[in-house]
Curated annotation (Swiss-Prot):
GO MF entries: ATP binding; metal ion binding; pantothenate kinase activity
Stretches that traverse the bilayer: none
CDD domains: ASKHA_NBD_PanK-III (cd24015)
Summary of the function given for this chain in its UniProt record: Catalyzes the phosphorylation of pantothenate (Pan), the first step in CoA biosynthesis.
Subunit (UniProt): Homodimer.
Requisite cofactors: NH4(+); K(+)
Keywords assigned by UniProt, alphabetized: ATP-binding, Coenzyme A biosynthesis, Cytoplasm, Kinase, Metal-binding, Nucleotide-binding, Potassium, Transferase
Record's protein name: Type III pantothenate kinase
Length: 255
């Protein structure tokens, strides 16, 4: 079986594939202070609770936007699974031309999503990934990664409001029932939620116009299912897009 690891700034998502089938997945908090052994103990316990053994893993692939943790997880793969992992980065075979001023600047997760999205839909795409930052990526009909936009994520935006405005509390991110709210908490939730829906739809609309195409719009990431119902532009939510992209990249780079 294949272990895929997606390291984000807020969460680490792990998945186990048996062939093309996702057998199990987990989401844990990203903690740059954790050691290799601490992550090893955590993963061992997750496997144990799922009735899986570390010896069932035959390969590991890692995508990371947190450089300090890349080495930690590489050592984990060597120490706990007895194998060197494939790490998404320069030199990896993606099968996708990257039309970026400096291809090395593109986050690994953005390329992984683009590969998975194009593999499934085989047409031009805008991929919206709701992570610590929200990314908007355009893939053209030829399967070329053309770039995109990056905006502050929902959680970052909400925390900034709490931290920088003395009288405003920390609030949960929810889909509110009304835009004209009658208390401070609900007013913040309405502004955050519907303001973010507007941000997403405006960026996507402008990207569509600039591309001079009619790309399909898909969303992924932890908060995609929260925003998508109110969005006028998001057509589908692909919950496991990044994990699926890692599986595809592993297959393309097998020796």
């Amino acid at each position: 079986m294949l272990l895929v690891i997606d390291v984000g700034n807020t969460n680490i998502v792990l998945g186990i594939y048996d062939g093309e089938r996702l057998v199990r997945d987990w989401r844990v908090s990203t903690d740059k202070a954790r050691t290799t052994d601490e992550y090893g103990i955590l993963i061992n316990e997750l496997f144990r609770l799922a009735g899986l053994g570390l010896d069932q893993i035959r390969a590991v692939i890692i995508s990371s936007v947190v450089p300090p943790l890349t080495g930690v997880l590489e050592r984990l793969s060597l120490g706990y699974f007895g194998m060197r992992p494939l790490v998404v980065g320069p030199g990896i075979k993606t099968g996708m031309p990257i039309q970026y001023d400096n291809p090395r600047e593109v986050g690994a997760d953005r390329i992984v999503n683009a590969v998975a999205g194009y593999e499934k839909y085989r047409t031009s795409l805008i991929i919206v990934d709701f992570g610590t930052a929200t990314t908007f990526d355009y893939v053209n009909r030829k399967g070329e990664y053309c770039g995109g936009a990056i905006a502050p994520g929902l959680v970052i935006s909400t925390e900034a409001l709490f931290q920088r405005a003395s009288k405003l509390p920390r609030v949960d991110i929810i889909r509110p029932s009304a835009i004209i709210a009658r208390n401070t908490v609900n007013s913040m939730q309405a502004g955050i939620y519907y303001g973010y829906v507007g941000l997403v739809d405006e960026i996507v609309t402008r990207m569509k116009a600039e591309s001079k195409d009619a790309p399909r719009v898909i969303a992924t990431g932890g908060l995609a299912s929260l925003i998508a119902p109110e969005s006028k532009t998001i057509e589908a939510v692909e919950e496991y897009l990044t994990l699926e992209g890692l599986r595809i990249l592993y297959e393309r780079n097998r020796e």
